[in-house]
C-alpha cells in the first residue's frame, strides 16, 4: 500500500498510495479497503501525501497528516485540500453525499445551513421520506421543512408520497441547489 508509484504524465511526483488512472479520474487506494476518487489535474496536490480512510459521523473521508504554519501535525481531509479551504469554519459539501468522491464538480463551499440541507433522510425516520412523519393517531402523514430555524408545516396527507412531494417542492423553493429531495 505504501509503495511509491510514479505516474508517466507526472514523473516528478512520487505517490505514497497505490492509484489507478481511469480517464480523467484517479482512484486512490486507502485503508479499510476503501478508495477515493478525484480529478487527474489534482494528482500533483494529492499524490505526495499518505492517505487513509476515516469515519466521521455517518460518512467516510480520505484524510492525511500535514504540518501547519507553526509546525504542528494536523489532519486534513482530501476534499478540503482540493478546494483549498483551510478555515475550519468554512464547510465543503459533497453534492452526491459520497465523502470519498472528491471530483471538483462534486465539491462546493457551503454554509452550515446549506450543508445541512444536503443531508439524507434521518436514520430513525419511519415514513421512508425526508421531511415526512406519520401521526399514529390519525394515520395521516405530515410534511414539514425547516427554513431559517423555523419549522414550516406544509400540510397533512393521506399518502406518504404526497407528503414527500410537498416536502420536495418546498425544499427546491427554499434550499435551491442544496436541496436534498426524495424524488
Predicted regions and their residues:
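Conserved recognition-core residues within compact binding domains
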Residues: 1-92, 97-183
